[in-house]
């Protein structure tokens, strides 16, 4: 089989399964509205959960940062790319979340890959929730350590896997809020079992940070759990992009020496760090509380109105509200029907989710209004 035949076969298989991904160029894709092909849609696919991507205070901070620092960092943080803006953001994040140190990364994917690649050796074991993000599972699969997966949120199965002999260290990996189901991990129980077996806990709280808990401190804070490794990202609740790893001082020093994604990547622009500092200030303020309260009310309104639909509504109290459709083609058809009625919704299919669980991944944000939720419900009920 030639290279071209190999590529064609893979693409043909995706097409046959109604699983071929595609991108849509949009003129505006975050916030309440999505604009594509000169048409405006109510946007129920954005991860901008607090509606901060267009916040004037954050935009102003980015502009001022660009004027002060330029539009790029100029290099890796180990060379010339570690700005005083980066340092200030790291210190503010660490203080906010109760850790000694924070290290910035260009994306959540890079942060997860870097930590696992740097921490794990051949004699070690990763025990991951089987619904963990692709960045976590891919890094675990590529690492020299053993990978075992436990049934989603099943602490008993986790304990059984941890109890089996392991010559090295054990790292338990899970998410705070799961990206495709919107449910939360039982972190207190997971941490207890992990500690009983002398393991460390790594939590990716991409979809909880900024959105859940006191001052938006996230799922771990809400459940009174402090994992050894906490990954937070800035493309969701913060409305920007990037990520950080929260950890002890010694672990931070270790990652600075051995995390290749950190060492060999150009740092995020200092202007972006300034925007993130402004976003954090909003998240921690009374305005942040008001945005979280509004989002919670929108979620309650949606869940109350969707109960009698012929789909499975995932058990989620988060901004992620998946409607499990099952069949790939049916999910695509339903997403297209919603778009025709002015609601932009994305169909999520395997391999992103397990086979037979294709879904509409609906996301609600604080930028929405109650009438937007009512319109979505009207269309879902076939009255659009």
UniProtKB/Swiss-Prot annotation:
In which pathway does this enzyme or protein participate? Cofactor biosynthesis; biotin biosynthesis
Q: Which PROSITE patterns match?
A: AA_TRANSFER_CLASS_2
Its keywords, alphabetically, are: Biotin biosynthesis, Pyridoxal phosphate, Transferase
Cofactor list: pyridoxal 5'-phosphate
Annotated binding of pyridoxal 5'-phosphate, by residue: 108-109, 179, 207, 233
State the signal peptide span: none
Q: Name one GO molecular function term.
A: 8-amino-7-oxononanoate synthase activity
N6-(pyridoxal phosphate)lysine modifications at: 236
Q: What is its EC number?
A: 2.3.1.47
What Pfam families does the entry give? Answer: Aminotran_1_2
The entry marks the following residues as binding substrate, namely 21, 133, 352
Q: How does it assemble?
A: Homodimer.
Family per record: Belongs to the class-II pyridoxal-phosphate-dependent aminotransferase family. BioF subfamily.
This chain belongs to which protein, by name?
Answer: 8-amino-7-oxononanoate synthase
Q: Which organism is it from?
A: Escherichia coli O157:H7
Gene for this chain: bioF
């Amino acid at each position: 089989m030639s290279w071209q035949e190999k590529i064609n076969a893979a693409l043909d298989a995706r097409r046959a399964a109604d699983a071929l991904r595609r991108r849509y160029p949009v003129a505006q894709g975050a916030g309440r509205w999505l604009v594509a092909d000169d048409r405006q849609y109510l946007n129920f696919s954005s991860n901008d959960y607090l509606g901060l991507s267009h916040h004037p205070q954050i935009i102003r901070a980015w502009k001022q940062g660009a004027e002060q620092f330029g539009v790029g960092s100029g290099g890796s943080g180990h060379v010339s790319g570690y700005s005083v803006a980066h340092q200030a953001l790291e210190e503010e994040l660490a203080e906010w979340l109760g850790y000694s140190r924070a290290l910035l990364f260009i994306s959540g994917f890079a942060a997860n890959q870097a930590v696992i690649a740097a921490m794990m050796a051949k004699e070690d074991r990763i025990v991951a929730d089987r619904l963990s993000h692709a960045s976590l599972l891919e890094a675990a699969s590529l690492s020299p350590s053993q990978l075992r997966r436990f049934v989603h949120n099943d602490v008993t199965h986790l304990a059984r896997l941890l109890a089996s002999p392991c010559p090295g260290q054990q790292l338990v990996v899970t998410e705070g809020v799961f990206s495709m189901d919107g449910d939360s991990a039982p972190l207190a129980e997971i941490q207890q079992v992990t500690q009983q077996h002398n393991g460390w806990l790594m939590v990716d709280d991409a979809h909880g940070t900024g959105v859940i808990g006191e001052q938006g401190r996230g799922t771990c804070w809400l459940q009174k759990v402090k994992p050894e490794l906490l990954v937070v990202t800035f493309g969701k609740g913060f409305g920007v992009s990037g990520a950080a790893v929260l950890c002890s001082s010694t672990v931070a020093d270790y990652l600075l020496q051995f995390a290749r994604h950190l060492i060999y990547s150009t740092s995020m622009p200092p202007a972006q760090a300034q925007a993130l500092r402004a976003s954090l200030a909003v998240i921690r303020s009374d305005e942040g509380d008001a945005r979280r309260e509004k989002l919670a009310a929108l979620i309650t309104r949606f869940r109350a109105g969707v109960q009698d639909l012929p789909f499975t509504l995932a058990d989620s109290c988060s901004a992620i509200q998946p409607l499990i459709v099952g069949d790939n083609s049916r999910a695509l058809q339903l997403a297209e029907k919603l778009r025709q009625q002015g609601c932009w919704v994305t169909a999520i299919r395997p391999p992103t989710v397990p086979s037979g669980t294709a879904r509409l991944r609906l996301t609600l944000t604080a930028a929405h209004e109650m009438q937007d939720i009512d319109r979505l419900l009207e269309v879902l009920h076939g009255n659009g």
